[in-house]
Amino acid sequence: MPGAGDGVEESCSGGEGAVPGTGSEAGAVAGREPSRLCGYLQKLSGKGPLRGYRSRWFVFDSRRCYLYYFKSPQDALPLGHLDIADACFSYQGRDEAAEPGADPPTHFQVHSAGAVTVLKAPNRELMTYWLQELQQKRWEYCNSLDMMKWDSRTSPTPGDFPKGLVARDTTDIISQHPNPSAEKARTVLAVEAAPGELVGDRAAHQPAPGHPNPINFYSLKQWGNELKNSMSSFRPGRGHSESRRTVFYTNEEWELLDPPPKDLEESLVPEERKKPMPEGSKGVASSGFPFEFGRNPYKGKRPLKDIIGSYKNRHSSSDPLLEGTATSSGSSGGPTKPVPEMQLQIQSQQEELEQLKKDLSSQKELIRLLQQTVRSSQYDKYFTNPQISQGVPGDTLELLHQKDEQILGLSGQLERFGLEKESLQQEVRTLKSKVGELNERLGMLMETIQAKDEVIIKLSACEGSVSSPTLGPSSPLAIPASKDQLELDRLKDSLQGYKSQNKFLNKEILELSALRRNAERRERDLMAKYSSLEAKLCQVESKYLILLQEMKTPVCSEEQGPARDVIAQLLEDALQVESQEQPEQAFVKPHLVSEFDIYGFRTVPDDDEEEKLVAKVRALDLKTLYLTDNQEVSTGVKWENYFASTMNREMACSPELKNLIRAGIPHEHRSKVWKWCVDRHTRKFKDSMEPDYFQTLLQKALEKQNPASKQIELDLLRTLPNNKHYSSPTSEGIQKLRSVLLAFSWRNPDIGYCQGLNRLVAVALLYLDQEDAFWCLVTIVEVFMPRDYYTKTLLGSQVDQRVFRDLLSEKLPRLHTHFEQYKVDYTLITFNWFLVVFVDSVVSDILFKIWDSFLYEGPKVIFRFALALFKYKEEEILKLQDSMSIFKYLRYFTRTILDARKLISISFGDLNPFPLRQIRNRRAYHLEKVRLELTELEAIREDFLRERDTSPDKGELVSDEEEDT
């Protein structure tokens, strides 16, 4: 029967459709982790007339000291970022021309990467809070560069420190603490500022504080798409055409201020009515639509600025009628339409009224012209009629014809004069109304002058009592005093603003000076380190040249010669490792290979000199491979980009994440990704348990005696003796290992404890906390591995060995035939690979890359890497021609494999296809066979015990004296 772990990889196969963590889970995570520095700010962007403030969601990333900004909290990809580590900050003081009591400016500048970014906070307090927090983050990040002891395998960014036992090595302090005087000065110059509701994760659930603007903001691309869609709806059969698409490309952060489609259509209709209908559209006037977009020559010629301008005119508030309507509607108590809708309706009615007036005047002019034409045609008809012109002389007819033309001309002139008279009368009426207004203003001015004359008379009468202090505040003499008071208040406000600005700038200068000194000290240390490395290289090169020179000289075999002394000196120098006796020289002292690697494993054993030399060579080869890989586009950059895309969302299964994990998780991110993998697989268990479930098990293990506790104590020091975290009984790792194993023995009494579980927990504790390591063990035993994998019979482990034998015969037939030919049982070696997931079988770098993929994809990864190890050394194994040498080589060949990239390429590339269904079917097939064999063995054992118990001669021992007697 397949185990619980068979469907693990299927849960991640559909990564693109995976759903991120639920809201409750996200809330729980947010409750455990410290609050992030995030919130809404307005960023000045754009060019030309479109330049303005746009509301953006800002999130600070402590790993790289970047301030990312998004369009909204729901966006996955950031629009850009600001490098805070190399930035300096400033802000403008209060404007001198501002009135007293006016709000101070709330925008500040971030100078970074040769550019100035202007950000604006909703109020002054939030601006101060953002500036202080960004200063603090910059200070902590730059100081952490000095406080960290960097290994070449760690990232240069000090964020996301590991949380397990390796975290103790990561945070070793090798330099002095920051300058106490600088810290004290920073504290004194700090300004009290509390975060508001627009800062923190809770701000993501609130609407973005926008800039008041009558025009709705839409992006250029969205506006173009809406226009295209609205046009295609009027053109049947061409709505889905892909050949008529207009796309705007830009590398700037541009946004177009444009109206919604509905308002745009309303603004377009009056504009189209003003234009005469072309001849080609007369036949379409009676159809359902008054015009067609595809054939209207005026539609495409209308510039974009006319559309936006018409919309701005419609929304302008200069019309007094609009203001009056808005005021009346706002003051009425009954249910009315919203003010914008009523304004739009009144505006459209006014435009329609103006259009009707223009149409009426044009119709009148047309009627007048038609009347003149009718008269002229009647006169022409009258004179051309032969019956009327009979008997009349030609001269008389010519004279009459001229008189008629004069009459027509005079009639037209009379009509024109009539029109001019009407216009002049209208102008006279307008001038009369203006004269009336001017008379009213003149009356008001006369009244004002009269009032001033009265004041002057009163002042003249009270000339003797000018110095009297009984003047009230309403007296004209109090006006200069009030102006002085206003000026004094304005100066006080400016003084207060300059004080706060001066305090901030002093703090900024102090911090930048301290950070510059730290950077200079780091540069000096690095220069000293590189000089020491260069000197050491010259020494080694000199010794090699001496050695080569001596090798040319023939030396008697009995004599020692200087060459042997040089070789001995070179070997002695090569076997030296880094010591922790003088940590203050750690920056200057060159160390290529440390005594322990970043995981805590010993790099050079304490055995004979030959073994130490081989281990040193292997460690140097590992470091060379790592440095060579880092010279290319490293996976660390891809991981940073991935985490940048998850600033506003939870991690989820995806092909991108699977490929990143297969290539290996960087050391600084491994704790985070491992914890996420464990939480994803154990979510169903945790949801049904109490929050303090692990602590309850741990308390039970301490209070009650467990049958497995004795075996656990025996195996603690034998777990990873070559790792410094588990080397002594007082090590922190030993205490945590004991707690996790005891807690699991109480959770799963069917297994209790099995040898091999201790190594699984020990590896997990290197990157996970105690409780997370417990759930990691639950994931491996109860989710990944089949049932009875770690029980007394090891049924699942035996089944997997037979499945692996079948896969080896299929994927590597030559090697399988070679093993069968010399009767080599390689499962004696591979059994431990599967039981403890390659712990103590491969070098540490490869081990943790295997565990990365194992915790994400499940147990199928073990089959992949086991086959890849054999394929990696297939040619070397085929050269061995006897069973003893083959078996001896199999016992240590995995420790000689150092190239993790090549091994991963074989595992996930050369061995494909590798379907999970095949492993399931093979497991089910071999499970029945192994069960039958175990049943037969159990029956044989019971028969043997029964015969032994029923035998009369129980084989009692007899002494020599009894035999003699």
From Swiss-Prot:
<feature type="modified residue" description="Phosphoserine">
    <location>
        <position position="317"/>
    </location>
</feature>
<dbReference type="GO" id="GO:0006897">
    <property type="term" value="P:endocytosis"/>
</dbReference>
<feature type="domain" description="Rab-GAP TBC">
    <location>
        <begin position="664"/>
        <end position="858"/>
    </location>
</feature>
<comment type="function">
    <text>GTPase-activating protein that plays a role in the early steps of endocytosis.</text>
</comment>
<keyword id="KW-0967">Endosome</keyword>
<feature type="modified residue" description="Phosphoserine">
    <location>
        <position position="155"/>
    </location>
</feature>
<dbReference type="Pfam" id="PF00566">
    <property type="entry name" value="RabGAP-TBC"/>
</dbReference>
<dbReference type="Pfam" id="PF00169">
    <property type="entry name" value="PH"/>
</dbReference>
<dbReference type="InterPro" id="IPR050302">
    <property type="entry name" value="Rab_GAP_TBC_domain"/>
</dbReference>
<feature type="compositionally biased region" description="Basic and acidic residues">
    <location>
        <begin position="260"/>
        <end position="277"/>
    </location>
</feature>
<protein>
    <recommendedName>
        <fullName>TBC1 domain family member 2B</fullName>
    </recommendedName>
</protein>
<feature type="modified residue" description="Phosphoserine">
    <location>
        <position position="475"/>
    </location>
</feature>
<dbReference type="InterPro" id="IPR035969">
    <property type="entry name" value="Rab-GAP_TBC_sf"/>
</dbReference>
<keyword id="KW-0175">Coiled coil</keyword>
<keyword id="KW-0597">Phosphoprotein</keyword>
<feature type="domain" description="PH">
    <location>
        <begin position="34"/>
        <end position="139"/>
    </location>
</feature>
<dbReference type="InterPro" id="IPR000195">
    <property type="entry name" value="Rab-GAP-TBC_dom"/>
</dbReference>
<dbReference type="InterPro" id="IPR001849">
    <property type="entry name" value="PH_domain"/>
</dbReference>
<feature type="coiled-coil region">
    <location>
        <begin position="339"/>
        <end position="537"/>
    </location>
</feature>
<feature type="region of interest" description="Disordered">
    <location>
        <begin position="310"/>
        <end position="340"/>
    </location>
</feature>
<feature type="region of interest" description="Disordered">
    <location>
        <begin position="1"/>
        <end position="27"/>
    </location>
</feature>
<dbReference type="GO" id="GO:0005829">
    <property type="term" value="C:cytosol"/>
</dbReference>
<dbReference type="GO" id="GO:0005096">
    <property type="term" value="F:GTPase activator activity"/>
</dbReference>
<feature type="region of interest" description="Disordered">
    <location>
        <begin position="257"/>
        <end position="288"/>
    </location>
</feature>
<feature type="modified residue" description="Phosphoserine">
    <location>
        <position position="959"/>
    </location>
</feature>
<dbReference type="GO" id="GO:0005769">
    <property type="term" value="C:early endosome"/>
</dbReference>
<dbReference type="InterPro" id="IPR011993">
    <property type="entry name" value="PH-like_dom_sf"/>
</dbReference>
<keyword id="KW-0343">GTPase activation</keyword>
